[in-house]
Amino acid sequence: MRIKINFKGSNTAYENNNLKQVKGWFEDNAIGRHNDMHDKFSNYSLSPMMGGKRNGKYISYPDGGYVYFTTMDIELINMVSNNLFCNCKGSKVGDLEYKWFESVPDFHIHSDFDLVRTMSPVLMRMKDKSYMTVKDEKFIDELLSRSKRKLIKVGLNENKVNTLNMSMFHPENASTVNMQYNGIPNIGSKVMLVVTGDKHVRETLYSMGLGMSTGCGFGTVTVNE
């Protein structure tokens, strides 16, 4: 299930990204700051602010911006929808004022495989504080392993989860991205993937996002029609 959260336009220019501001607004107005769904594991994906126009290292949203919220958790989507309806009038992310939210079509899951593209970088921090990126030979192995652990954690059948597989699509176009979050430098990966396996498993994975910190704007994906 997917929600598109729309914001009115502003000519204010923002430097780099506004991941922290989006997350803060979402916690204050839609999901609450005091729950167990933040930080280490989120069963949802919250995208960065999209719809902007970039000029060098700055980005502005003269025509408005939008954020995607995606989850397979019905209770969570209902809670967020109710809070957006009741609590958000006049609230802002920076100078971008909340406008409305709308349900959008779920991911189109194909019968055999999906072509999946990252809308925001996939983040995988290792125990030694280094980052696993598309430049690493074991990137896919690590991403697949983490994805399976997340899927099992939300209650999916382990045998069905183990049907999941993924490979790079046009790896020559994959890239790394340096992004700061709350003053902390992070290195993420932009990539296209071929994903196979049980259809419900695939859909659940996309709804949670890829990698870590999917509730902070990382790892948001889209599926090619």
Model-derived regions: residue spans:
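RNA-interacting cores
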Residues: 1-225
